[in-house]
């Protein structure tokens, strides 16, 4: 995790790879700059994290002598995305750095909420701030893992309806995502882990809010979680055209 004590917030800077700066540990050159599309998704993710926790994120312009705590860039390679956890390379500057596959440039730049690329941005940033896969045994020293079963999909909550960090589309599912249904944001177990690590933002959605078919994207199946810190709220699905499952479990 970032910081020295659980439950505490902090300021974290992030920067986009610039060709005037360097990634000394990469196996291939980072020669493609981020476009506005993926930058917007990344900013949305950091805004979401700030609304959930006491973390504050700020964008830093890279120079040869100055880079963010978290660095993001495109890199050629077999994986669509990869991230160094904050404690994985504690003696180096690698912790928190993220790269996305250059060959999928067009897809990253056109990513939309609920698709594979949008979810992968959130997933990799999740790793960078200290979340592990629920099926992993804790490869990063400070990463928080829900459950301890190493078989993908066999854990009762190892599924995307509970955590964006899961590789399973549904409970009991194996490795792989559903083509048309992915978590749109950090899910309930992710939020519990994040708030344990970095505290809860109790100023988010404290009024009387309405959530439902008038405010959510409904053109395909989706999974989402709402963090609401107070007020008298309403979930309204009167205008929905798809069947829904609403889970109010604490």
Region annotations inferred by a language model:
Residues 1-250:
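Zinc-dependent metalloendopeptidases
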